[in-house]
Amino acid sequence: MQADELKGIDLSDLDELEKERLAMGQKAFKMIVYGFLGIIVVSGFLASLHLGNLFFFLLIGGVFYLGKTINGLKNELIAKFKQKVVSVIVKNYGLNFSANGGLSLNDFYKIYDADVNRHYAEDMIYGQIDETQFKLCDFYAAKETQGEKRTTTTVKFQGILLKAEFKKELNATIYVCDKKRTSDLRSDGELAMMDNPKFNELFKTYTTDQIAARYALTPKLMENLTTLRTKFNAPLSAVFLKNEIFIAIDLRKDSFEPDLKKPINSNESVQNYIAGVSDFVEIVRDLELNKNIWKS
């Protein structure tokens, strides 16, 4: 494997992580087999004591314990992966990574007007690109409803949330709403028809000032947002507020975790890790916030 040499990034810990992945799979398999055999033995014992009605509770408890233990092993390996792989790739771009860091719910609410009672943020990449300070992270937001028998979870958003700063300050608020999202997006102000037909096909634009919207959404920026929307093939919405832009890409997945069903150290996997980080870091560079949007 030539993972260490790919793009000059030192990923020499991948082979050790792959050994841990294989060991975890073997351990999980043994736990399932032994747990199943144990349940059979104990259920037979309970039946001999005429306590067969306890079998159901034993089964539920056993499944819960196995699931929790195996999930713990998985999370431990993922944490090591983020520390030894994702962090190294991010630092190669001259940026910083915090596995437990993230943007706030208030940042999420800059774009979304959703009823949320469960959320978390993780895997924050932050720093400066081309004079633009930014933060981006994996963000999850959902509404949990407690019913009589079970809890229903409605996922409102799961994807990348980005916050970046630019040098000029706007006197208006501008919302760029993906047309595939028919609800939960903020859309204050009046509808603004922009001069880019392709942009208008993908987005609805709302603003508190029509002139400011055309000042902020330059032809270059509209083209870049359209390109990003096509590239990720997922709902993308944004808001311009004072000297900040917030972007949400609803990918419906965690973006910085490995596929533990595949070898961690294969060249294909390594290329995917690098491309995964690169795709999101390049968002800031592609937008060219402090280069092409507003002239001094």
Describe the function of each predicted region.
Residues 1-8, 32-35, 49, 294-296:
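Intrinsic disorder/low-complexity detector
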Residues 2-13, 78-94:
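Juxtamembrane membrane-interface segments of multi-pass membrane proteins
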Residues 37-41, 60-62, 108:
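Core hydrophobic alpha-helical membrane-spanning segments
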Residues 87, 91-143, 147-296:
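Charged, low-complexity intrinsically disordered regions
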Residues 25, 62-88:
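Transmembrane-cytosolic junction motif
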Residues 1-29:
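Cytosolic juxtamembrane N-terminal segments of multi-pass membrane proteins
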Residues 45-60:
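Hydrophobic alpha-helical transmembrane segments
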Residues 26-41:
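Transmembrane alpha-helical segments and their cytosolic interface motifs
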